[in-house]
């Protein structure tokens, strides 16, 4: 050829010797300091000061300070060990581990874990979907939405909304001025000051003061050792143990034990269904409904109704201005002043004065040692021993002994069925006629109509074969058998069985403690409380609350507009329309439509054969079998199997711990967490996270826009479109297209017969067999065989440790490390290298096949450099070579009779080295901005980069 290298080489064939030790890598290296557009990992060990936007698509490891004044968009992990000061938005989709202070003044959106050991000051929104562990102060002035655990050991000051769906453990002060919605445990050891709503569904353990000015709804235990000042509603369904003062100005509804050792001042309603032990003063200005024991050692001043179903032991004064209904023992050692009705079904022992201005109904013993002045009715079914004066101006019905040692003045009817020993005056001015109140303690057998215009108190059986029209209250403690219509306009309290074969129309409350069998329509406009079975064969229309503790079997429509609380089985064969909450603890079998607009809490099986439309939360702990459509707009939490044969549309979270078998479409817009098998034969559209720990078999399309974590097999026969991460630990068999835009980590086999398009990392530890195209833009790490029959385009690193057989083109722009056989029958284009570093006084390059080095000079070739006609590289013996262009320096490797092609980035011109002679078709221009390196392998008859 005769051509010489000219100015390109100082020595065309000189051996330069060993390059500097710090410039030698295992395979080859080059200087990429001046390269632009590098879009893979960045690893920085010194300060990093970036004064404009930083956009990183690979890992970012920074071991010293990072100071960023533009947007920072990181789409993979960021690990920072120095201070990080970001003055504009930070958007991170991988883990972020910061071991020193982070100060952010723009939005911070993190879609994976954040672990921070220094202060974190965020002055705009933070949105985090992975765990967030902060071991020092966090100060946030924008919204904070955390969808996984947050663990904070320093102060946390949040001045806007915080929404947390994982555990929240705060070991120092939390000060929140926006709404706080926590759907899992919160454990707080410092003061907690919340100036807006707090809604907590997990345990809440607060070991210092809590001060809340918005509603507080807690659906699990609250344990507070400091003062608790709540200025709006508190609703608690778990135990509440408060060891210091509680001051509440809104309603307080507690459905489990409350134990309070400090003063308790409640200025609105309190509703408690567990024990309530108060060891200091309680001052209540709203209704107080307690359905278990209340034990109070300080004064108790209640200025509205008190309703207590457990023992009530008060060791100091009780002053009540509303109704007081106590259904178990009351023991009072101080004065008791009640200015409205008192209704007591247990013993009542009062050792000081009782002054009552409303009705007093006592169904067990009353023992009074002070004066008792009652200015309205008293109805007593147990002994009544009064050792001082009793003065009564209303009816007095006593069905057991009354022993009175003081004057007794009764100015209306008295009906007494037990001994009455009065040791002082009794003065009665009213009759006892059935045209007013009737009080009967024996059987009552009426074979025709009974028409009563006053109260009817029957303490034994009533048997009626004609119509019974009662225009005032009926109170029955024995069986009541009515074989024709019953029409009642007052309260009806039945404490034993009621059996009715005609219509029953009750326009006020019905309270039944025995079985109730109604064989025709029941229409109730007041509350209905049934504590044993109800069996209804006609329509049942209830326009207020129904509370049932026995089985309820309804064979026609039930329409309920108030709460319905059923604590045993409900079996309904007609439509069931409930427009308020339904709470069911037994099986619920509905064979026609159920339409529920309030919460529905079912703690045993639900079996529904008609449509089920629920417009608020459904919480089910038994199997749920639905054979027609289910449409749910609130959360749905099912802790056992769900089997659905119609469409299921859920517009909020679904959390399922048993199998879920759906034979038609499922459309879910909230998170879906399934901890056992899901089998779906219709389309499944999930617009938030899906987390599945059992098999998932989908026989039609699955479209998921949130993370999808599957810990067992997934078998999909329709398209699968996932727009966030998919993490699968079992086999994944997909027989149609899979399109994934987040990471995909599969730890067992993947078998795909349609196209697979993944726009983020894919990590596979089992075999992967793809029979159509695979297009991957993130790293792909496969630790077992990959067999692909369509094109495979990978735009980032691929690392494969098993055989890889590709029967069509593969195009890879990142590193590709394959440690076993690769057999490719189509084109394979790989456009990146493995490693790089810079040398001294020019660049050194080492080949794995030869140690012969060529020294390179700076500068571009001149125009009068020699040219050759065979510069395209054909006709020479060609083996492996390497092309490197960086800045204005050519980097050339010459190995024996090998050739290297140089491609200019802009003009596609070529430089060929062959037999140590330079051949060129056209000398490229100065490529100062060139920034790529291409390893090249050519055949002997055509050199193609």
From Swiss-Prot:
* Predominant location: other
Region 66 X 12 AA tandem repeats of D-D-C-[ND]-I-T-G-D-G-N-E-T: what ranges? Answer: 40-831
Superkingdom of origin organism:
Eukaryota
Q: Does the keyword Cytoplasm apply?
A: no
Q: Subcellular location, in the record's words?
A: Flagellar pocket; Cell membrane
Transmembrane residue ranges:
883-903
Residue span of region Disordered: 1-20
Any one Gene Ontology biological process term? endocytosis
Q: Which residues lie on this side of the membrane: Cytoplasmic?
A: 904-945
Q: State the UniProt keywords alphabetically.
A: Cell membrane, Endocytosis, Glycoprotein, Membrane, Repeat, Signal, Transmembrane, Transmembrane helix
Q: How does it sit in the membrane?
A: Single-pass membrane protein
Leader sequence range is 1-23
Q: Name one GO cellular component term.
A: plasma membrane
The residues bearing each sequence repeat, given as ranges, are: 40-51, 52-63, 64-75, 76-87, 88-99, 100-111, 112-123, 124-135, 136-147, 148-159, 160-171, 172-183, 184-195, 196-207, 208-219, 220-231, 232-243, 244-255, 256-267, 268-279, 280-291, 292-303, 304-315, 316-327, 328-339, 340-351, 352-363, 364-375, 376-387, 388-399, 400-411, 412-423, 424-435, 436-447, 448-459, 460-471, 472-483, 484-495, 496-507, 508-519, 520-531, 532-543, 544-555, 556-567, 568-579, 580-591, 592-603, 604-615, 616-627, 628-639, 640-651, 652-663, 664-675, 676-687, 688-699, 700-711, 712-723, 724-735, 736-747, 748-759, 760-771, 772-783, 784-795, 796-807, 808-819, 820-831
Q: Which Pfam family is an annotated match for this chain, by its short name?
A: CRAM_rpt
The record's function comment reads:
Supposed to function as cell surface receptor. Possibly involved in receptor-mediated endocytosis.
Protein's recorded name: Cysteine-rich, acidic integral membrane protein
Origin species: Trypanosoma brucei brucei
């Amino acid at each position: 050829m005769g051509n010489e290298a000219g100015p390109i080489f100082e020595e065309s064939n000189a051996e330069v010797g060993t390059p500097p030790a710090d410039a030698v890598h295992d395979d080859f290296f080059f200087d990429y300091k001046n390269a632009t557009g590098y879009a893979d990992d960045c690893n920085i060990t010194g300060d990093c000061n970036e004064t404009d936007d930083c956009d990183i698509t690979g890992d970012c490891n920074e071991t010293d300070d990072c100071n960023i004044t533009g947007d920072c968009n990181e789409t993979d992990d960021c690990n920072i060990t120095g201070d990080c000061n970001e003055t504009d938005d930070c958007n991170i989709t991988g883990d972020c581990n910061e071991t020193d202070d982070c100060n952010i003044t723009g939005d911070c959106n993190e879609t994976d874990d954040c672990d921070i050991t220094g202060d974190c000051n965020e002055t705009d929104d933070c949105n985090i979907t992975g765990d967030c562990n902060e071991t020092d102060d966090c100060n946030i002035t924008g919204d904070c939405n955390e969808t996984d655990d947050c663990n904070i050991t320093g102060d946390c000051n949040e001045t806007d909304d915080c929404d947390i769906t994982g555990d929240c453990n705060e070991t120092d002060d939390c000060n929140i001025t926006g709404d706080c919605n926590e759907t899992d445990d919160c454990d707080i050891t410092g003061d907690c000051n919340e100036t807006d709503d707090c809604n907590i569904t997990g345990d809440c353990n607060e070991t210092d003061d809590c001060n809340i000015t918005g509603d507080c709804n807690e659906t699990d235990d609250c344990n507070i050792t400091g003062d608790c000042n709540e200025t709006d509603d508190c609703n608690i369904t778990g135990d509440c143990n408060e060891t210091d003062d509680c001051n509440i100005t809104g309603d307080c509804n507690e459905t489990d034990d409350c134990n309070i050792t400090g003063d308790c001042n409640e200025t609105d309603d309190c509703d408690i269904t567990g024990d309530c032990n108060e060891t200091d003063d309680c001052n209540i200005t709203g209704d107080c409904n307690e359905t278990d024991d209340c034990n109070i050692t300080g004064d108790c001043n209640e200025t509205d109704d008190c309703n207590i179903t457990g023992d009530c032991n008060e060791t100091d004064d009780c002053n009540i201005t509303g109704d007081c209904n106590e259904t178990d023992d009351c023991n009072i050692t101080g004065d008791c002043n009640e200015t409205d009705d008192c209704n007591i079904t247990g013993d009542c022992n009062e050792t000081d004065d009782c002054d009552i201005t409303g009705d007093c109904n006592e169904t067990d013993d009353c023992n009074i040692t002070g004066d008792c002045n009652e200015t309205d009715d008293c109805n007593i079914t147990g002994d009544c021993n009064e050792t001082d004066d009793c003065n009564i101006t209303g009816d007095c019905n006593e069905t057991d002994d009354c022993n009175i040692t003081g004057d007794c003045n009764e100015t209306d009817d008295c009906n007494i069925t037990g001994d009455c020993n009065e040791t002082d005056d009794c003065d009665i001015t009213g009759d006892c006629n059935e045209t007013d109140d009737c009080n009967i303690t024996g059987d009552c057998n009426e074979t025709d109509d009974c028409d009563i215009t006053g109260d009817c108190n029957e303490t034994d059986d009533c048997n009626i074969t004609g119509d019974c029209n009662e225009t005032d209250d009926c109170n029955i403690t024995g069986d009541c058998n009515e074989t024709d219509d019953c029409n009642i306009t007052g309260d009806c309290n039945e404490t034993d069985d009621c059996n009715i074969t005609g219509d029953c129309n009750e326009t006020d409350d019905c309270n039944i403690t025995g079985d109730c069998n109604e064989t025709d329509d029941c229409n109730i406009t007041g509350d209905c409380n049934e504590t044993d079975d109800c069996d209804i064969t006609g329509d049942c229309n209830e326009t207020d609350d129904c509370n049932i503790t026995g089985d309820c079997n309804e064979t026609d429509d039930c329409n309920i507009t108030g709460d319905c609380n059923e604590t045993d089985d409900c079996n309904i064969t007609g439509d069931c329309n409930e427009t308020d909450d339904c709470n069911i603890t037994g099986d619920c079998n509905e064979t026609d439509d159920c339409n529920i607009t309030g919460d529905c809490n079912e703690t045993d099986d639900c079996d529904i054969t008609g449509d089920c439309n629920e417009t608020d939360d459904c919480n089910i702990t038994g199997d749920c079998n639905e054979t027609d459509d289910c449409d749910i707009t609130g959360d749905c939490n099912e802790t056992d199997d769900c089997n659905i044969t119609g469409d299921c549309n859920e517009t909020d979270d679904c959390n399922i711990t048993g199998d879920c078998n759906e034979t038609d479409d499922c459309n879910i817009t909230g998170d879906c967490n399934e901890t056992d098998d899901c089998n779906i034969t219709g389309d499944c559209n999930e617009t938030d996270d899906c987390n599945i720990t059992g098999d998932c078999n989908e026989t039609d399309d699955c479209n998921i826009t949130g993370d999808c974590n599957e810990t067992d097999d997934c078998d999909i026969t329709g398209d699968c479109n996932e727009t966030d991460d998919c993490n699968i630990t079992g086999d994944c068999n997909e027989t149609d297209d899979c399109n994934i835009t987040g990471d995909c980590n599969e730890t067992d086999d993947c078998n795909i017969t349609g196209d697979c398009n993944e726009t983020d990392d894919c990590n596979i530890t089992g075999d992967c067999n793809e029979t159509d195209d695979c297009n991957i833009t993130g790293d792909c790490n496969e630790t077992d065989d990959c067999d692909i029959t369509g094109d495979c385009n990978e735009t980032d690193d691929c690392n494969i440790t098993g055989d890889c057989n590709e029967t069509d083109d593969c195009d890879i722009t990142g590193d590709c490390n394959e440690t076993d056989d690769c057999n490719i029958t189509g084109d394979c284009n790989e456009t990146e290298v493995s490693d790089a570093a810079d040398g001294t006084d020019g660049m050194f390059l080492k080949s794995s096949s030869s140690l012969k080095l060529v020294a390179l000079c700076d500068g571009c070739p001149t125009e009068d450099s020699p040219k050759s006609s065979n510069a395209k590289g054909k006709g020479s013996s060609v083996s492996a070579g390497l092309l490197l262009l960086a800045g204005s320096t050519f980097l050339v490797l010459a190995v024996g009779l090998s050739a290297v092609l140089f491609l200019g980035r802009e003009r596609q011109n070529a430089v060929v080295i062959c037999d140590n002679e330079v051949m060129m078709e056209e000398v490229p221009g100065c490529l100062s901005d060139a920034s790529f390196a291409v390893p090249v392998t050519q055949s002997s008859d055509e050199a193609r980069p």
